[in-house]
């Protein structure tokens, strides 16, 4: 009924939020690693 429909919507939006947050975290990690690699390549310390 109405309750299960509401629950599904809530779960879906919760999952999307988790995925977005996880994606952001992973993206930031990748960015930091990329910056570190570029930095050491510029300095020639790789």
Curated annotation (Swiss-Prot):
Keywords (alphabetical) are: Amphibian defense peptide, Antibiotic, Antimicrobial, Disulfide bond, Inflammatory response, Mast cell degranulation, Secreted
Q: Where does the sequence pass through the membrane? A: none
Task: Give disulfide pairs as residue numbers.
Answer: 40-46
Provide one Gene Ontology cellular component: extracellular region
Cell compartments where the protein resides: Secreted
Top-rank taxon, per record: Eukaryota
Which BP terms in the Gene Ontology apply to this protein? Answer: defense response to Gram-negative bacterium; defense response to Gram-positive bacterium; histamine secretion by mast cell; positive regulation of mast cell degranulation
Keyword field contains Metal-binding: no
Question: Briefly, what is this protein's role?
Answer: Mast cell degranulating peptide. Causes histamine release from rat peritoneal mast cells in vitro. Has antibacterial activity against the Gram-negative bacterium E.coli K12 and Gram-positive bacterium M.luteus NCT C2665.
Family the entry assigns:
Belongs to the frog skin active peptide (FSAP) family. Esculentin subfamily.
Q: Any idea what this protein is called?
A: Esculentin-1SEa
Q: Which organism is it from?
A: Lithobates sevosus
| Source taxonomy | Eukaryota, Metazoa, Chordata, Craniata, Vertebrata
